[in-house]
Amino acid sequence: PIIKGINKGAGLNGIHVINCDPHSDMRPMLGRHSGNGFLYAYSEGYLKKYAVFGLHESYNIYSALELFEQHKEQLHFETYDDIFVREQISYQLALNNCLHFCKGAACGVEIDLDSIQNVPVSARTPSGMLPIDVRKYVYHCGSELEVCYLHIAEGAPVLAHKQMDNKTGKLVAYIITDFVKAVKRNIR
């Protein structure tokens, strides 16, 4: 709904999106928007280019990865495994690849908090980016792209099996502050 709303509200004909997320959210379109929201936006023409930064290889189905392979001009990813596990590409080069891919049009910035290690979310991960990695990501996105929105997804500071965790709110505040500073710097 965000991508469609930006297009319609701003009179655009497709935007780019960069997403820091272990999941591509490009699962088959089987009805409900769960794990397939970006595929709906792409199929409907609202999403022209899509880059995923920090994709976890084992969290994505084959058909989604195959779609990226078949549509390299519009779809790109850099994996968490290549960056942090195998160290085949540096963090900065992987991020630069995604940023370069998304330049040239209005761009949405997405952050799924389940990309960050041990943050209380519905799909909490013991193996993810550190908060500083995501803060750098959002800062570079805000300062280098023609940003049209920021969406922070999946925060769940209160889960049925957990006590209230105010660290999630603090982390989100850091992310928003870094983003605002970067966009402000980019406008100058």
Predicted features and spans:
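Conserved alpha-helical scaffold segments that buttress catalytic/binding sites
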Residues: P1-R188
